[in-house]
Curated annotation (Swiss-Prot):
GO MF, any single term: rRNA (cytosine-N4-)-methyltransferase activity
Keyword tags: Cytoplasm, Methyltransferase, rRNA processing, S-adenosyl-L-methionine, Transferase
Binding site for S-adenosyl-L-methionine: A32, G33, H34, D52, F79, D100, Q107
Major location (coarse): cytoplasm
PANTHER family attached to this UniProt entry: 12S RRNA N4-METHYLCYTIDINE METHYLTRANSFERASE (PTHR11265:SF0), S-ADENOSYL-METHYLTRANSFERASE MRAW (PTHR11265)
NCBIfam families referenced in this protein's UniProt entry, alphabetically: 16S rRNA (cytosine(1402)-N(4))-methyltransferase RsmH
Lineage: superkingdom: Bacteria
InterPro entries membership: RsmH, SAM-dep_MeTrfase_MraW_recog, SAM-dependent_MTases_sf
The encoding gene: rsmH
Source species: Bacillus velezensis (strain DSM 23117 / BGSC 10A6 / LMG 26770 / FZB42) (Bacillus amyloliquefaciens subsp. plantarum)
Protein name, per record: Ribosomal RNA small subunit methyltransferase H
Length: 311
């Protein structure tokens, strides 16, 4: 069963300012929580295009959302191909788009997917299980310098060098096959006082490897720019991020697209062609309420940003 607690459900979907006859995109179907709530607000003329790379998520949605068959289009694809996939369905512009960039709970909780540091499983971490690159390849074949770089850049891990060195020493003797082996190496590399604070010691390295395996930051950057491009005037984009790298990327893109360019001082009216493309709906990110956090601890790091297309 594909069970998953949706984060910031109403805030994200209501923030899109749903029009019953509109066309919307859920770039991250997952457990279909956002999609279900959105579909409930659409008329028979409304449409939702939902993306996922995960076969289990798509099969689950086919069953649970069967009553919306006429309004729902399910797409098995990475959302970096957003614009291309919409064109394949004859869609050139939409009224709203949402991204929920968290790994879905079933992916985390299914040990054999290799995402979790709580279960011993083969090193995998692929969102799309037909993709070539796995966590096992990253851990065993990437150079020491590349491991240091991704642990520091994507995991913001202070002990990147020590962990990469420990991995390098271990894999010279025999390949690192499982998440459990990797967790033990990380624990050995981090000084004891640091292990006792800041959550699970493997959290940051696992995040870094997952981002590298799935090329998450590059994919998100490409998809967000495409999303802004295909929005109709007045259309909105809602983005939920779970770590500072994605949030920073979203914040900077929204800021850049909602800021005026350098103009000569004293212009009485800003020429239309210089008006910014976006208007910020959220100046500061929306975070989960106390009530939601009591029900779903995974919402703790979630941040929601919303912007509207001006023209």
């Amino acid at each position: 069963m594909f069970q998953h607690k949706t984060v910031l459900l109403r805030e994200t979907v209501d923030g899109l300012n749903i029009k019953p006859d509109g066309t919307y995109v859920d770039c991250t179907l997952g457990g279909a929580g956002h999609s279900t709530y959105l579909l409930q607000q659409l008329s028979e003329k409304g449409r939702l295009i939902a993306f996922d790379q995960d076969d289990t998520a798509l099969e689950n949605a086919k069953k649970t959302l069967s009553e919306y068959k006429g309004q729902l289009i399910l797409v098995k694809s990475n959302f970096r191909y957003l614009k291309e996939c919409l064109h394949e369905h004859g869609i050139t512009s939409v009224d709203g788009i949402l991204f929920d960039l968290g790994v879905s709970s079933p992916q985390l909780d299914t040990p054999e997917r290799g995402f979790s540091y709580h279960h011993d499983a083969p090193l995998d971490m692929r969102m799309d299980q037909s993709a070539a690159l796995t966590a096992k390849e990253v851990v065993n074949e990437w150079r020491y310098e590349d491991l240091v770089r991704i642990f520091f850049k994507y995991g913001e891990e202070k002990f990147s060098k020590q962990i990469a060195r420990k991995i390098e020493e271990a894999r010279e003797k025999s390949p690192i096959q499982t998440t459990g082996q990797l967790v033990d190496l990380i624990k050995d590399a981090i000084p004891a006082p640091a292990r006792r604070s800041g959550g699970h010691p493997a959290k940051r390295v696992f995040q870094a490897i997952r981002i590298a395996v799935n090329d998450e930051l590059q994919v998100f950057e490409e998809a967000l720019l495409q999303a802004i491009e295909v929005l109709k005037p007045g259309g909105r984009v809602s983005v939920i991020t779970f770590h500072s790298l994605e949030d920073r990327m979203c914040k900077m893109t929204f800021k850049e697209k909602s800021s005026l360019p350098e103009l000569p001082p004293g212009l009485p009216v800003i020429p239309e062609e210089f008006e910014p493309e976006l208007k910020l709906i959220t100046r500061k990110p929306i975070t989960a309420s106390k009530e939601e956090l009591e029900e779903n601890n995974r919402a703790r790091s979630a941040k929601l940003r919303i912007a509207e297309k001006r023209k």
